[in-house]
Amino acid sequence: MVRRLGADDVRDLFKVRRTLELQAISASQPLREYQSDRMLEALEATELAREREDWRAVGTHSLAFHQHIVGLLRSPLFDEFFTNVVAQLRLVFCTAPDESRFQAPWLARDRQIHDLLADGDKPAAGDAMSLYLDDSEQLLLQLLAPSSHH
């Protein structure tokens, strides 16, 4: 049986995401070409999956983008830890009653975060990521709410 994650789990996952992703942005050096390329590859894969309406793949590639954000910390231990966080998020996404509704809005915002980082605007990238994580958490909690009453 697949473990179902509840609202408290989601809040905890987003606490971890905020800690790692916002720290990665604030502590980052200017993006190196290979770092930008990895992020852009994840964004392009997300775009292709969205065009195919393969929402599970959209979620997977979007999370790969966020793994590359955490990768800016240059810590194999954080990378490994965040891989586990991503796996748990995938479980949550899969249990959301309408994964397409959840996944649809994020690509443009991921791209904006990349572009701000590429331009060296860490404060704006951090603000955009913070708002992104707040909105993502709230939407995910809303999507999970109907199923939590059963």
Residue ranges and their predicted role:
Residues M1-P30, E137-H150:
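Short linear motifs at protein or domain termini
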Residues F102-A104:
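Active-site loop of classical SDR/Rossmann-like NAD(P)-dependent oxidoreductases
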Residues G120:
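Residue-level signal for the nucleotide or nucleotide-sugar donor/cofactor binding architecture
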Residues A27-S28, T46-E53, A96, L117, ...:
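Secondary-structure edge/capping motif, primarily at the C-terminal ends of alpha-helices
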Residues E99:
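Membrane-interface catalytic loops of GT-C/OST-like multi-pass glycosylation enzymes that act
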Residues D8, L13, Y34-C94, W106-D115, ...:
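Conserved amphipathic alpha-helical segments that form helical-bundle/coiled-coil interaction surfaces
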